[in-house]
Amino acid sequence: MAGDSDSKLDNHAENEHVDWQPFLIGVAGGTASGKSSVCGKIMELLGQNKIDHHQRQVAILSQDSFYRVLTPEQKAKALKGQFNFDHPDAFDNELIVKTLCEIMEGRTVQIPVYDFVTHSRKEETVTVYPADVVLFEGILMFYSQEIRDLFQMKLFVDTDADTRLSRRVLRDISERGRDLEQVLNQYITFVKPAFEEFCLPTKKYADVIIPRGADNLVAINLIVQHIQDFLNGGLTKRLNGCLNGHTPRKRHPSESSSRPH
């Protein structure tokens, strides 16, 4: 019967949608190791950084967006450079897990925006639409097993301590309104010990270690090739679905991979 046939096609199409999942890549490494630069280079080599947002197949998220909301006492400490932002408890892991699960289900998600000058979440959020590949970078991306196990590929950006410190000093002074003494005190008191205790031990979970960060084009090109193979395989699967009368995942023309809300 036509009704039964239509029902079977609908069910099959629904199953095709359920079977589809984005490729989640975790990118960890010490502070100012070049995680964002590596993600940006991957986007560039994939040709994703200069195309229309609604055609973008790759999205980038940062663990920095998921700092917990501080109490008044914690915020007062933070403004004096006395709060440890490199400790696992500084991050809202529950929200990270919830966001990643929604991304895996192909949903549009709202990402918090963190203000590093005032140490607070802004009222606005960033809208991230469904993408085929999602890069999620942060200093402690692999610390929580629950989060770590969600990634199909794990990268660790390995940069020497002197380079990371010099980059952090320049960044925090120019972008975050800190003075040199505060940056150095925070590094010695919190950043360096936290790296050695919480971040560095997670290096063992990485599938690929990238020395020298974005300067290591050999490693990045290998990763890009792997992502391209995934994207091409996904495209073939969706095209086959169309040929068989199934409906692939669609994105509204007005949707972008990431934009302010």
Curated annotation (Swiss-Prot):
Substrate binds at residues 86, 114, 119, 168, 178, 186. GO terms for biological process: CTP salvage; UMP salvage. InterPro entries: P-loop_NTPase, PRK/URK, Uridine_kinase-like. Pathway: Pyrimidine metabolism; CTP biosynthesis via salvage pathway; CTP from cytidine: step 1/3; Pyrimidine metabolism; UMP biosynthesis via salvage pathway; UMP from uridine: step 1/1. The keyword Acetylation does not apply. Keywords: ATP-binding, Kinase, Nucleotide-binding, Transferase. GO terms for cellular component: cytoplasm. Coiled coil: none annotated. It catalyses: uridine + ATP = UMP + ADP + H(+); cytidine + ATP = CMP + ADP + H(+). The keyword rRNA processing does not apply. ATP binds at residues 29-37, 215. Pfam families: PRK (PF00485). One of its GO terms (molecular function) is uridine kinase activity. It is an enzyme of class 2 (transferase). Phosphorylates uridine and cytidine to uridine monophosphate and cytidine monophosphate. Does not phosphorylate deoxyribonucleosides or purine ribonucleosides. Can use ATP or GTP as a phosphate donor. NCBIfam families: PRK05480.1 (NF004018), udk (TIGR00235). Homotetramer. PANTHER family: URIDINE KINASE. Belongs to the uridine kinase family. This is Uridine-cytidine kinase 2-A. It comes from Danio rerio.
